[in-house]
């Protein structure tokens, strides 16, 4: 008998899943809005055979973008409102952030956002190859201690599956205020099949033209840290 269910990989997850007690309205958002906004069966429990998501059915054939760790959702909702012809999937395991995003989606309206409240690696499993046109990684957890650097997103464990799901020529944006995270990003991302598009220092010092500053970035600026805006392009092959 052929084996149809792949072995579930062992994945350690680091970081918060839940913070302060949710407000009543946030619990309502989770109860009422999360299931309708799901991108499809992503978890191993719901999709043990890891069948690919049908993005054409999900977004009516629209181009698809991905935000990895959307925090409170400011940037994701801004992009969705500014680009109604694009479908955007956000992945975030921190349930308080998910609830904040759902509230913003209610206020903004629109039908082009889907939300995965969990580990983006599970989402990578079920995204079709070369299906994503743009990806965002904005102020990810810096894991500042050296022994924890392997927990950062910019490692082969995350970058290789990201590269698989991005179309050739797709754009990958990274924003961070941590100099050592910049260093690791510039070392690891090109190795995964990307080219850095900066031609001059101003290219990483200036925010993107469609950028909206997030709460985390405002906190970094108040504390004297310098944002870096890195743009990469997925290479062919």
Curated annotation (Swiss-Prot):
UniProt entry keywords in alphabetical sequence: Methyltransferase, Plasmid, S-adenosyl-L-methionine, Transferase, tRNA processing
SUPFAM superfamilies assigned: S-adenosyl-L-methionine-dependent methyltransferases
GO molecular function: tRNA (guanine(46)-N7)-methyltransferase activity
GO cellular component term, pick one: tRNA methyltransferase complex
InterPro entries associated with the record: SAM-dependent_MTases_sf (IPR029063), tRNA_(Gua-N-7)_MeTrfase_Trmb (IPR003358), tRNA_methyltr_TrmB_bact (IPR055361)
Active site: 141
Gene3D superfamilies: Vaccinia Virus protein VP39 (3.40.50.150)
Pathway(s) served: tRNA modification; N(7)-methylguanine-tRNA biosynthesis
Family designation: Belongs to the class I-like SAM-binding methyltransferase superfamily. TrmB family.
HAMAP family, alphabetized: tRNA_methyltr_TrmB
Protein name: tRNA (guanine-N(7)-)-methyltransferase
Organism, as annotated: Ruegeria pomeroyi (strain ATCC 700808 / DSM 15171 / DSS-3) (Silicibacter pomeroyi)
Gene transcribed to yield this protein: trmB
């Amino acid at each position: 008998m052929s084996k149809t269910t792949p072995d579930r990989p062992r994945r350690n997850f680091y970081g918060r899943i839940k913070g302060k007690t949710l407000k009543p309205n946030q619990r309502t958002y989770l109860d009422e809005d999360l299931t309708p906004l799901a991108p499809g069966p992503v978890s191993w429990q719901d999709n043990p055979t890891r069948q690919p998501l049908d993005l054409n059915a999900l977004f009516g054939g629209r181009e698809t973008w991905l935000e990895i760790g959307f925090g409170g959702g400011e940037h994701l909702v801004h992009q969705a409102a500014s680009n109604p012809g694009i479908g955007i999937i956000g992945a975030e395991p921190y349930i308080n952030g998910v609830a904040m995003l759902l509230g913003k989606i209610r206020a903004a309206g629109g039908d082009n956002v889907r939300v995965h409240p969990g580990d983006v690696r599970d989402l990578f499993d079920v995204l079709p190859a070369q299906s994503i046109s743009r990806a965002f990684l904005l102020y990810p957890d810096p894991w500042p201690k050296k022994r924890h650097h392997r927990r950062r997103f910019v490692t082969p464990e995350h970058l290789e599956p990201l590269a698989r799901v991005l179309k050739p020529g797709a754009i990958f944006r990274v924003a961070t205020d941590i100099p050592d995270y910049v260093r690791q990003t510039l070392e690891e991302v090109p190795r995964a099949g990307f080219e850095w598009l900066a031609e001059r220092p101003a290219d990483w010092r200036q925010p993107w033209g469609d950028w909206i500053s997030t709460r985390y970035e405002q906190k970094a600026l108040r504390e004297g840290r310098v944002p870096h805006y890195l743009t990469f392009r997925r290479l062919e092959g």
